[in-house]
C-alpha cells in the first residue's frame, strides 16, 4: 500500500482518502461470545503502518476508513466471511438473533483511534 500511495501521489499530485481497506475472514464465535480475530488486527496494523510510512515519504493522506464497522451481507459470500469489528449473529438464511458482539479488533481499533494511530501494537 505504501508503494501504491507513492505512485498515486507521483502521478496525480493530489491528496488521497483511503475509503475502504479491510479483510473478510471466517470469524468464529466462542461459547462465551468472544471473537479472537488477530488476523484482522495484523492485517490492518500492517496497512496502517504502511500508510504512516507513506505519509513520512511525503504522501498527503486525508483519511483512512476500514471496510466496515459491523459485519455485512456480502453479495458474494453472504454472511460466511465477516468484515467488521462487530460480529452480527446472522446467516444467509436469516437465522440468527441479530445480537452484536465486539471482536478483539474492535478494542484494538478503538485504541488506534484514541492514540491517533500512535499505538498500532496488539
Set out the residue ranges of the language-model regions.
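Non-catalytic scaffold segments within catalytic domains of secreted glycoside hydrolases
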Residues: 1-122
